[in-house]
UniProtKB/Swiss-Prot annotation:
Its main location: endoplasmic reticulum. Glycans are attached at residues 31, 39, 180. This is Transmembrane protein 39A. Regulates autophagy by controlling the spatial distribution and levels of the intracellular phosphatidylinositol 4-phosphate (PtdIns(4)P) pools. Modulates (PtdIns(4)P) levels by regulating the ER-to-Golgi trafficking of the phosphatidylinositide phosphatase SACM1L. Pfam families: Tmp39. Belongs to the TMEM39 family. The chain crosses the membrane at residues 72-92, 110-130, 155-175, 182-202, 287-307, 319-339, 420-440, 446-466. It comes from the Eukaryota. Keywords: Autophagy, Endoplasmic reticulum, Glycoprotein, Membrane, Transmembrane, Transmembrane helix. The gene is tmem39a. It comes from Xenopus tropicalis. InterPro entries: Uncharacterised_TMEM39. It is a multi-pass membrane protein.
Length: 488
């Protein structure tokens, strides 16, 4: 009506009905930053930190059962037996004879051409393959308590006799090999060590960032403590002899102890724990790769280098045997050095670390954004800016550095606890299936014998992987709330 009371206009009604931005999101929501309007400028609002507004979901861990793991001495013995079987198979593939020919044929008396085999080379390879077993025996004998001086003297004498015997056989085989072979062939004897040491030196000296030194809460014994304290000095240049001594000591060391996880609450402690675990995992993977390649080299490749030019052998089958030995040795060493308890430790640390997803510029322009702070625990779904980029929190508990690629890689590998176990199971299962297929199509007696012997060893490894996968799959699928655990 013309003379009546006018109500509020549409524009005034819309403005009064909508709450303010500060009421919706609580102001800046953390770390002295503000929201952004449509023009991109920041609105300076004072508000409590984001952890006071949104509580991050607490990290809960599953309890996994204690799965049996082979002891260090037992594993080294089984691994040595497997390598000897693989070496015997390679010699069969190279020096087999046609023993079913008539007896007047020159190569019909035995199944192998024993007169062509270099026994000095076979003894040298055996000594090189037994290095870990010998050191495991010495380490186990050193840890046994001595009740009397007689017992202690007997242990010292046994260690000296064992080391003297191995050293004498090693020197005796080297002298005979130097007499009977050319220099080019002799270079293949120490090729793995000649390649490993420069690569190890380059890897250690090329580190640009020192590892954290406050990793004492991760270790359980002095052996691991010494290794953790020494990791901080990797960036300092050292002479070649010290690197060589350290590299050789790593090759003779037994299985390292598994670190512990203390569920730290401070973001700095979580990142330091991740750095220490990352260095420990890289050291274990380096040991797995080198020892598997070392074993395959001396078992399947080195005998081929000393075959006479007039000797015929199946090159394709010998190379296939080389690949099978390397894959199975890799899986065996991985199951020993990366047991389920250790993988669960990495999974727990990755759950505390979290992950950030990088977003495109212009996306989420109207959503609240914050400046990333290293002292803040960020909940899931929060948008932060770091190094001129926009990131979104993926994990329920995020303390990782958004621009740190190693943190994202660590979370990707270990946030699923069964990822490594599934990978090893797929590799070993594929190898066993291929060997069964090759066994069905085998027509030569040496092919059938070699596949059957290797399969007998692979079945044991496959059984352990399947057992761990079934048990851990049930354990991780069990509801965490039923444990009655307190969140960390």
């Amino acid at each position: 009506m013309p003379g009546g009371r006018r109500g509020p206009s549409r524009q005034q009604l819309s403005r009064s009905a909508l709450p303010s931005l500060q009421t919706l999101v609580g102001g800046t929501c953390g770390n002295g930053t503000g929201l952004r309007n449509r023009n991109g400028s920041a609105i300076g609002l004072s508000a409590p930190p984001i952890t006071a507004l949104i509580t991050p979901e607490p990290v809960r861990h599953c309890h996994i059962p204690e799965l049996p793991l082979d002891g260090g001495l037992l594993f080294e013995f089984l691994f040595f037996i497997y390598l000897l079987v693989a070496l015997f198979i390679q010699y069969i593939n190279i020096y087999k004879s046609v023993w079913w020919y008539p007896y007047n044929h020159p190569a019909s008396c035995t199944s192998l051409n024993f007169h062509l085999i270099d026994y000095h080379l076979a003894a040298f390879i055996t000594v090189m393959l037994a290095r870990r077993l010998v050191w495991a025996l010495i380490s186990e004998a050193s840890q046994v308590g001595t009740s009397s001086m007689v017992h202690y003297a007997a242990l010292i004498t046994a260690r000296l006799v064992l080391l003297t015997l191995c050293g004498w056989v090693f020197c005796w085989t080297l002298v005979n090999l130097f007499r009977n072979h050319s220099v080019l062939n002799l270079l293949f004897l120490g090729y793995p060590f000649g390649v490993y040491v420069p690569l190890c030196c380059f890897h250690q000296d090329s580190r640009s960032q020192p590892l954290p030194t406050d990793c004492g809460y991760l270790v359980q014994d002095p052996l691991v403590d010494d290794g953790a304290n020494g990791m901080a000095t990797l960036v300092r240049p050292r002479d070649f002899l010290s690197l060589l001594r350290e590299s050789l000591r790593e090759q003779f060391n037994s299985t390292p102890s598994i670190p512990s996880h203390s569920c730290p609450l401070s973001p700095d402690l979580i990142r330091n724990e991740v750095e220490c675990l990352k260095a420990d995992f890289n050291r274990r993977i380096k040991e797995v790769l080198f020892n598997s390649l070392f074993s395959a080299y001396y078992v399947a490749f080195l005998p081929l280098c000393f075959v006479k030019s007039t000797q015929y052998y199946d090159m394709r089958w010998s190379c296939e045997h080389l690949i099978m030995v390397w894959i199975n040795a890799f899986v065996m060493l991985s199951t020993q050095l990366l047991p389920p308890k250790y993988c669960d430790l990495l999974h727990r640390s990755a759950s505390h670390l979290g992950k950030w997803q990088k977003l495109e510029h212009g996306s989420y322009s109207n959503a609240p954004q914050h400046i990333w702070s290293e002292n803040t625990v960020w909940p899931q779904g929060v948008l932060v800016r770091h190094s001129r980029s926009l990131y979104k929190a993926v994990g329920p508990y995020n303390v990782a550095v958004p621009s740190e690629v190693s943190h994202a890689r660590f979370y990707f590998l270990f946030h699923r606890p069964l990822r490594l176990l599934n990978l090893l199971l797929i590799i070993e299962g594929s190898l066993v299936l291929y060997q069964l297929y090759s066994l069905l199509r085998a027509e030569k007696w040496n092919h059938t014998l070699s596949i059957a012997l290797i399969l007998f060893c692979n079945y044991y490894v496959l059984f352990k992987l399947l057992r761990d996968r079934i048990v851990l799959g049930r354990a991780y699928s069990y509801p965490i709330s039923s444990y009655g655990l307190k969140p960390h």
